[in-house]
Amino acid sequence: MMPDHGELLYEGKAKRVFASTDPDRVLVEFKNDATAFNAQKKAQLDGKGRLNCQISARLFDLLEREGVPTHYCGLAGETWMLVRRVRIIPLEVVLRNIATGSLCRQTPIAEGTAIEPALLDLYYKDDSLGDPLLTEARVQLLGVADTAQLSAIEQLARRVNAVLLPFFDELDLQLVDFKLELGLASDGTLLLADEISPDTCRLWDRRNSNAEDRILDKDRFRKDLGGVMEAYGEVLKRVQGNCPNPRNCL
């Protein structure tokens, strides 16, 4: 069911953001669109929005219970959530626990190498530039964040990793790497925003040793492996087992 909402404020590749009756809250609708390679590859996957919304709600709740501040206020439907309005910082914050993907393409590090402590990478959130990898100096040159803000961003990201790693491990899921987006609330509080789902996390099934079959994330779409919705559904099934009842605002 669609909740009452105001005007469309923003539409991205995977979500729409609408005004709500509270100026400090917005409604987010998760779409069924699947995209990869900066939207060069696209598809409609029926049910994807619901799965990502339900997974994200439960993981935001988990993180809040562990003291990580997020924008999440509650579910507002199968594919909707109410969140705090934030000003998104134009950075994609990536934490890497296991070497794979672009890290292995850009360096001689072997696929599957454990990284401890996790590697934190910052990317400039700009599709027209291809989301380039940034140094700390470049982040400051762009005026995106100063030294103190970068320190706060790293602390929050590493706290998220410290909560999610053992949580997924209990579910026989290996948290390979993940992407976070952060934002500033009206009072200046740094909050975890966007979503946490198989669209933004690489998750490998410890119950399956096959290099392709173990993939339970967006790489199934990127690599044309098939079974995307089955993989996302399996992630929700396991997450639900430990986080059955997320907050909702219905």
Swiss-Prot record:
Reaction(s) this enzyme catalyzes, per UniProt: 5-amino-1-(5-phospho-D-ribosyl)imidazole-4-carboxylate + L-aspartate + ATP = (2S)-2-[5-amino-1-(5-phospho-beta-D-ribosyl)imidazole-4-carboxamido]succinate + ADP + phosphate + 2 H(+)
Keyword hit for Nucleotide-binding: yes
Pathways involved: Purine metabolism; IMP biosynthesis via de novo pathway; 5-amino-1-(5-phospho-D-ribosyl)imidazole-4-carboxamide from 5-amino-1-(5-phospho-D-ribosyl)imidazole-4-carboxylate: step 1/2
Top-level taxonomic group: Bacteria
GO MF terms held by the record: ATP binding; phosphoribosylaminoimidazolesuccinocarboxamide synthase activity
GO annotation, biological process: 'de novo' IMP biosynthetic process; cobalamin biosynthetic process
One Pfam family this sequence matches: SAICAR_synt
InterPro entries: SAICAR_synt/ADE2_N, SAICAR_synt_PurC, SAICAR_synth, SAICAR_synthetase, SAICAR_synthetase_CS
Keyword Ligase: yes
Catalytic EC class: ligase
Keywords attached to this entry: ATP-binding, Ligase, Nucleotide-binding, Purine biosynthesis
Entry EC no(s): 6.3.2.6
Record family assignment: Belongs to the SAICAR synthetase family.
NCBIfam families given in the database record: purC (TIGR00081)
Protein name: Phosphoribosylaminoimidazole-succinocarboxamide synthase
